Amino acid sequence: QPVFATKGLDDSIRLKASWCKGGRTRVIPITSEHQRAVLAKAHALAGSGSMIPPDKKYVTWLSTYKEATRVIGARKLHGLRHGYAQQRFESLAGFKAPAAGGPTRVELTLEQKQADYRARMQISAELGHGREEITAVYLGR
């Protein structure tokens, strides 16, 4: 439901708790023109309805979605979360996450450690977690 997700928002999308892992509502920032273009396509495709075509059941559409993500190189659906977290980390911290080939925690300056922590807390919230420790799964240490 792209209309619900973007209603009244210019710089983010709102995800219903029922759409999300862990049942937590999320607000995800829109940070690029590419994201805006994808959202425009989603609006055009779904209109005021769902991204799942009316003639398809959720289970059927999920298998189509899984195949599409596999084709683009995301071996599992969770891989999309990893990719998002790593890209978002680089944009917030100013350097790559360890899991993406960036420096490990022991290699960071004090200023970089502070940027690392702020970025991890932001990403943790965006992914629906409440603590920095969970970001190690997505970003490495």
Regions found by a protein language model. Name each.
Residues 1-41:
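Conserved tyrosine-mediated DNA breakage-rejoining catalytic core shared by Y-recombinases
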Residues 31-94:
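Active-site/catalytic core of tyrosine-dependent DNA strand-transfer enzymes
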Residues 62, 66-70, 74, 120-141:
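Extended amphipathic secondary-structure runs
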Residues 78, 97-98, 135:
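Extended hydrophobic-aromatic, low-complexity segments
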Residues 83-129:
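C-terminal catalytic core of tyrosine-transesterase DNA break-rejoin enzymes
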